[in-house]
Amino acid sequence: MAAKEVKFGDSARDRMVAGVNILANAVKVTLGPKGRNVVLERSFGAPTVTKDGVSVAKEIELKDKFENMGAQMVKEVASKTSDIAGDGTTTATVLAQSIVREGMKFVAAGMNPMDLKRGIDKAVIAVTEELKKLSKPCSTNKEIAQVGSISANSDADIGEIIAKSMDKVGKEGVITVEDGKSLQNELDVVEGMQFDRGYLSPYFINNPDKQVAILENPFILLFDKKISNIRDLLPVLEQVAKAGRPLLIVAEDVEGEALATLVVNNIRGILKTCSVKAPGFGDRRKAMLEDIAVLTGGQVIAEEVGLTLEKATLAELGQAARIEIGKENTIIIDGAGEGSRIEGRVKQIRAQIEEATSDYDREKLQERVAKLAGGVAVIKVGAATEVEMKEKKARVEDALHATRAAVEEGIVPGGGVALLRARANLGTLKGDNHDQDAGIKIVLRALEQPLREIVANAGDEPSVVVNRVVEGTGNFGYNAATGEYGDLVDMGVLDPTKVERIALQNAASVAGLMLTTDCMVGELAEEKPSMGGMGGMGGMGGMGGMDMGM
């Protein structure tokens, strides 16, 4: 086992904070409508230009292992916020840096880190409650467009196209983002269905960039039991191979010899296949398989209807224009099912909704209707160059996450104002002791930091703007894009409540862990032995026969 280097107390914390600052300073230049870009080196090809906080954070690895530990912990804040809320990564990073920076001053002054953390946690609970009170539902297309455009760095076109796509497929509908062929953004709405089951083996992936398996014009085999013996599958595989088209297998499970054979055939290019587990459980699984059959014009191979796997023919297989299978989701686009059959199926499910007694059953049935009737919206991102395309696509995906979060939990005034207003009751909040009160003060100071960074990136004086905004009430704030003060909701500067809440909770969680750290253990760098002297290279003395006296 390699030797370790151990740091204690202030020397450990100082190195950790240095790492936090390096990462946070790189990320926070992107905050706000006038935030700057960050250019990321790539080992091959053009560098990536981004204004996405989490993309910047993920690239940073520091040489000093103790500084790197601090940076990695803040990177976790950004990643976690991105995973849950889909946006707000830069805000979360700025909050974490501020809580750590302020908190370390109190720790250095001799306060108890555990009490500081308890005070921080109390303050965060109070602020999240206040955010919920400030929040209002996001229901109109105009509000959805405004949230989208703010998240996409004040790009109104992106906000508009997201609002349109949500209008077409519903707020719970499936929206995907693809590379476009022109300079303009385009919106395609395709009949389709998404269910939450992904590929059974990563060897089915044929698009490494997106980590998905894409099948164009495939057949779809629907089976209600497990498949483990390849002999049962061979007859239908041979028919599909002759037809020269890919195959998606949806079954209770595909395992053992059957899965191995499918993977080998796929890798060798003999037959392009992918297999996924059927969605749902028990009776719901049968119903959802039937939904897929109706949508794709196929039949579920089940013994109860007199069909067996060995005798299955192409006539029983469903078909679709395109299927995209990810790690956790499968999207069937443009199934070959008849419109009248799909309508009949939707009516049948709606009748079941009316008869359903439990909320859970009703919700699951409504999900099935949405999947059958909703379709899939595809936003095609247009750009002049590949570098611009990647940057724009990342912004569209961020904006999409933000609008979903807004629909889910509502909206609050943006521009860092909601966090400032949510401090309202922190002035009167008391901890159990003096150190906990200090923890509450840390959060009080941290909540103005996002606004300060937005203003600084816009080239204005943060303290002047913060004081002016604090004097105002409600939605009054500073619009950094135009340099004006006013009602931010009327100006269309909105943030999803969920994004603000998750950013604060994650930042406080990781910052609290850092404040309570008193020891760090890292790998000790191995000293490479020196090569030693070459020792005069004996035997070369004088090189006789050469007259040096020229």
Curated annotation (Swiss-Prot):
Coiled coil: none annotated. Its EC number is 5.6.1.7. It is an enzyme of class 5 (isomerase). PROSITE patterns: CHAPERONINS_CPN60 (PS00296). ATP binds at residues 30-33, 51, 87-91, 415, 479-481, 495. One of its GO terms (biological process) is protein refolding. One of its GO terms (molecular function) is unfolded protein binding. Its main location: cytoplasm. The keyword Oxidoreductase does not apply. Keywords: ATP-binding, Chaperone, Cytoplasm, Isomerase, Nucleotide-binding. It catalyses: ATP + H2O + a folded polypeptide = ADP + phosphate + an unfolded polypeptide. GO terms for cellular component: cytoplasm. InterPro entries: Chaperonin_Cpn60_CS, Cpn60/GroEL, Cpn60/GroEL/TCP-1, GroEL-like_apical_dom_sf, GROEL-like_equatorial_sf, TCP-1-like_intermed_sf. SUPFAM superfamilies: GroEL apical domain-like, GroEL equatorial domain-like, GroEL-intermediate domain like. It is found in: Cytoplasm. It holds the Pfam family Cpn60_TCP1. The keyword Nucleotide-binding applies. Together with its co-chaperonin GroES, plays an essential role in assisting protein folding. The GroEL-GroES system forms a nano-cage that allows encapsulation of the non-native substrate proteins and provides a physical environment optimized to promote and accelerate protein folding. Belongs to the chaperonin (HSP60) family. Forms a cylinder of 14 subunits composed of two heptameric rings stacked back-to-back. Interacts with the co-chaperonin GroES. HAMAP family: CH60. PANTHER family: 60 KDA HEAT SHOCK PROTEIN, MITOCHONDRIAL. This is Chaperonin GroEL. It comes from Aromatoleum aromaticum (strain DSM 19018 / LMG 30748 / EbN1) (Azoarcus sp. (strain EbN1)).
